[in-house]
Regions:
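Short stretches within intrinsically disordered, low-complexity N-terminal or propeptide regions
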Residues: 16, 32, 47-50, 168
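Acidic, Ala/Val/Gly-enriched low-complexity intrinsically disordered segments
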Residues: 3-5, 11-14, 30
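Short, Lys/Arg-enriched N-terminal segments with co-localized hydrophobic residues
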Residues: 13-21
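Bacterial N-terminal signal peptides that target proteins for export
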Residues: 20-36
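Short, intrinsically disordered, low-complexity terminal segments
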Residues: 11, 27, 42-47
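Residue-level detector of bioactive/disordered segments in secreted/extracellular proteins
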Residues: 9-13, 25, 38
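Bacterial N-terminal signal peptides
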Residues: 34-44
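Residue-level hotspots at or immediately adjacent to binding/recognition sites across diverse folds
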Residues: 7, 49-363
């Protein structure tokens, strides 16, 4: 276990957006908003344990031998290392493809909703109260970079171009940008045509094209200059999108959300095709929470009820596997063995490339 990291004073505060939050971090609505991009409004999170503003010092995440089996909302690669984040400030890392996990020392007990690494050392995690954590040692130790308790707005996703430049998205149209690795964060929500302050659930890079943001009420935004300017995209669907993945060819975008809705574009969002998802002949209606394009080119999308979708043709078609435990899933990466590492309602699990359980001796 690493030594406790030093406390760093949060830099700045986010200005209020046009939709003022009317909830506190303990309410069911707050938990719903923080999970909306990953668990299709499942109300799975335990109450967020916010630190009292009057309490001195730092409340570190409680060490638990069961952390790898509790709610985890996202997982990412830090080079060959895997890093997962979730409930009560838990951040775990694995150096053996997910077979074993070590809990990092983390200066919060807030619910963490997303984690992202720009390289094998520099990473960020975001969560409740606009909390942003940073690491420069591959996830072993973490420091707080930003927080806005007054706003009580959960951040829902984070993406970095490199070790210096990145964005965090969140509820009520929050969009934060840093150009110095997280030392300072600027509210740049006014770059978006989002006057209603719709929730921004996910952000991703579309290789060869730019950045793409998806959110509630069919919200879609794209940037061809790495976030300096943004254009609103005409959406093929007016429900909520929870995730977006770039394909293997320039311009390919796969966006997905409520009730099994999944759409594919080959021209960076100018036009869209609805992708039919079937379960024994019936339309898939599970909420789709997160996705990833693996090193071998497969696109994997996971969601409610143990849904695992896999595509070997850059998102033109998907095969469905419903995990027998029906536990909801919120994140996926591949490991060196070609298997999938899933996170969600029951923590972390290594499964076969299709999503099926591995033989006992391989788990």
């Amino acid at each position: 276990m690493s030594e406790p990291v030093m406390w760093r004073t949060p830099v700045g505060r986010a200005k209020k957006t046009s939709r003022t939050p009317m909830f506190n971090s303990q309410s069911p609505l707050a938990r719903t908003l923080s999970l909306c991009s990953v668990l299709s409004i499942l109300f799975l999170a335990a109450p967020a344990q916010a630190q009292s503003p009057a309490e001195p010092g730092v409340r570190y995440a409680i060490e638990s031998q069961k952390a790898a089996t509790t709610l985890l909302l996202d997982i990412a690669h830090a080079g060959k290392r895997l890093v997962a984040a979730g409930d009560r400030g838990h951040i775990l890392y694995s150096d053996d493809g997910g077979a074993s996990w070590t809990q990092a020392k983390v200066p919060t007990r807030q619910l963490l909703t997303a984690v992202y690494f720009a390289d094998d050392k520099h990473g960020w995690a975001v969560g409740h109260d606009a909390l942003i954590l940073g690491t420069t040692d591959g996830g072993l130790t973490w420091t707080q970079q930003y927080e806005n308790r007054e706003g009580e707005v959960p951040l829902l996703d984070v993406w970095f171009e490199n070790a210096q430049h990145g964005f965090a998205t969140g509820a009520y149209g929050v969009l934060l940008e840093t150009t110095d690795g997280g030392e300072n964060w600027e509210d740049v929500a006014d770059r978006l045509d989002n006057e209603d302050g719709s929730h921004l659930n996910a952000i991703a890079e579309i290789p060869g094209s730019g950045l793409f943001i998806v959110g509630e009420m069919g919200g879609m935004f794209r940037s061809a200059d790495m976030g300096e300017t943004w254009e609103r995209v005409e959406s093929p669907y007016q429900g909520s999108f929870f995730g977006v993945v770039g394909g293997g060819e320039p311009g390919v975008v796969v966006a997905f959300g409520l009730r099994g809705n999944l759409f594919r574009s080959t021209d960076f969002g100018d036009s869209w095709q609805a992708i039919e998802l079937l379960d024994d002949g019936d339309a898939v209606e599970s909420g789709l929470a997160d996705g990833n394009r693996l090193a071998d080119g497969r696109i994997i999308v996971v969601g409610h009820g143990g849904t695992v979708l896999s595509s070997e043709d850059d998102g033109q078609s998907f095969k469905l596997f419903s995990r027998p435990d029906r536990r909801s899933l919120s994140g996926v990466v591949g490991n060196p063995d070609g298997n999938l590492v899933l996170v969600g309602q029951s923590g972390v699990r290594i499964v076969s490339p299709t999503g099926a359980n591995l033989p006992v001796q391989q788990q």
